[in-house]
Curated annotation (Swiss-Prot):
<comment type="subunit">
    <text>The glycine cleavage system is composed of four proteins: P, T, L and H.</text>
</comment>
<dbReference type="InterPro" id="IPR029043">
    <property type="entry name" value="GcvT/YgfZ_C"/>
</dbReference>
<protein>
    <recommendedName>
        <fullName>Aminomethyltransferase</fullName>
        <ecNumber>2.1.2.10</ecNumber>
    </recommendedName>
</protein>
<dbReference type="Pfam" id="PF08669">
    <property type="entry name" value="GCV_T_C"/>
</dbReference>
<keyword id="KW-0808">Transferase</keyword>
<dbReference type="Pfam" id="PF01571">
    <property type="entry name" value="GCV_T"/>
</dbReference>
<keyword id="KW-0032">Aminotransferase</keyword>
<dbReference type="GO" id="GO:0004047">
    <property type="term" value="F:aminomethyltransferase activity"/>
</dbReference>
<dbReference type="InterPro" id="IPR013977">
    <property type="entry name" value="GCST_C"/>
</dbReference>
<dbReference type="InterPro" id="IPR006222">
    <property type="entry name" value="GCV_T_N"/>
</dbReference>
<dbReference type="GO" id="GO:0008483">
    <property type="term" value="F:transaminase activity"/>
</dbReference>
<comment type="similarity">
    <text>Belongs to the GcvT family.</text>
</comment>
<dbReference type="InterPro" id="IPR022903">
    <property type="entry name" value="GCS_T_bac"/>
</dbReference>
<dbReference type="GO" id="GO:0005960">
    <property type="term" value="C:glycine cleavage complex"/>
</dbReference>
<dbReference type="InterPro" id="IPR028896">
    <property type="entry name" value="GcvT/YgfZ/DmdA"/>
</dbReference>
<dbReference type="InterPro" id="IPR027266">
    <property type="entry name" value="TrmE/GcvT_dom1"/>
</dbReference>
<dbReference type="GO" id="GO:0019464">
    <property type="term" value="P:glycine decarboxylation via glycine cleavage system"/>
</dbReference>
Length: 371
């Protein structure tokens, strides 16, 4: 008997015919109508994802104390956030590895929310509590009290605007608003994990269940489909987004993990800041890069990466067949000296080397709003 936790939408997923799999300690839908159909719906119209397994951790207290605390354990500049802005960040351990990659929501100088990965929110909470200042800051893990769904795709804005009967254009990319729905205030954030425009919507559990069912029905004429983890994975790999446990872990720094763009110099030092800033300036022996196959084959995790002479230069961290590009693509940790856009490499699939190239440019243009 599975001991995996179930999201509040578990029975709804079963009713919709979802295939369920264990993921990060949760029993989650991997697909409904099919991964490719769900992927294409999100790229061309819209997809609805259950992400209520994610963590919500609230940080409240004295403004100065909160800011000093958050700045000391992250590599991006929390100080640069304005109210109702969201930031992609990494919570670091003392060796410069990642406890988790997170999004930080600033409600006010006295209140922040950290959205963390499902498998990590307990570790994040423990890490925060371990390094909490003596006074002035409170950490409250509310992960099991919140419901979260993600509406993603080029028609997401039209669908949700008409559903709520209000203009949502004022919510810019990586911003959020508190909006009334069914007598409750919900968090509507213009963020996502697909490379498309869309929203991540936080609410109470009863409202979340109602919102999922009503939104799914309302969006049908627009081509909205419920989507599982399978499509979520193909979409995020096409968008070159990392996944904890694959491109990110507690050993690799943000520079090695390919998210060096979030590493900032700050007024005060943070965990391993000297090491990480040195790496950003001087480079690292290996780092995450993306690749595309130039012949038939589907790459997966932990396949050997070879140079054109057949020498091993790295390992794949994620791989899939891209429904949009109709070829195998992926991410890999590769020796930095070998990284060059268009550089021929080989991915060893079932002991057979398959031709590929390193791809520094985006796989897909996407429809993310940068306003």
């Amino acid at each position: 008997m599975s001991q995996d936790k179930k999201t509040p939408l578990y029975e709804t997923h079963r009713t919709l015919g979802a295939k369920m799999i264990p993921f990060g300690g949760w029993d989650m839908p991997v697909q409904y109508s099919g991964i490719i159909a769900e992927h294409n719906a999100t790229r061309e119209a819209a997809g609805l994802f259950d992400v209520s397994h994610m963590g919500e951790i609230f940080i409240t207290g004295n403004p100065k104390s909160i800011l000093l605390f958050l700045e000391s354990i992250t590599c991006n500049s929390v100080a640069s956030l304005s109210d109702f802005q969201v930031q992609y960040n990494a919570i670091l351990n003392q060796n410069g590895g990642l406890v988790d990659d997170v999004t930080i929501y600033k409600f006010s100088s006295e209140k922040y929310m950290i959205c963390s990965n499902a498998s990590n929110y307990e570790a994040v909470t423990e890490h925060l509590l371990e390094h909490l200042p003596i006074s002035g800051v409170k950490v409250d893990n509310q992960s099991l009290q919140w419901h979260q769904i993600a509406l993603q795709g080029p028609k997401a804005n039209e669908i949700f605007s008409k559903f709520l009967k209000r203009d949502l254009d004022s919510i810019q990319y990586y911003r959020f608003m508190l909006l009334p729905y069914q007598g409750e205030e919900i968090i509507v954030s213009r963020t996502g994990y697909t490379g498309e425009d869309g929203f991540e919507i936080y609410s109470s559990i009863p409202i979340g269940l109602k919102l999922w069912n009503e939104l799914l029905e309302f969006g049908k004429p627009y081509g909205l489909l419920p989507c599982g983890l399978g499509a979520r994975d193909t979409l995020r790999i096409e968008a070159k987004y990392p996944l904890y446990g694959h491109e990110l872990n507690d050993q690799w720094t943000p520079i090695e993990s390919g998210i060096g763009w979030i590493v900032k110099e700050k007024e005060n030092p943070y965990f391993s800041s000297e090491k990480i800033l040195f790496q950003k300036k001087n480079g690292v022996p290996s780092k995450i890069v993306s690749f595309a196959l130039t012949e038939a084959g589907v790459p997966r995790e932990n396949f050997r990466v070879l140079d054109s002479q057949g020498n091993e230069i790295g390992k794949t961290t994620s791989g899939t067949f891209s429904p949009s590009l109709k070829k195998g693509i992926g991410l890999a940790l590769i020796q930095s000296e070998k990284i060059k856009d268009g550089e021929p490499i080989q991915i060893e699939i079932r002991e057979q080397p398959k031709q590929a190239i390193i791809t520094m440019k985006p796989f897909i243009p996407g429809s993310i709003r940068k306003n």
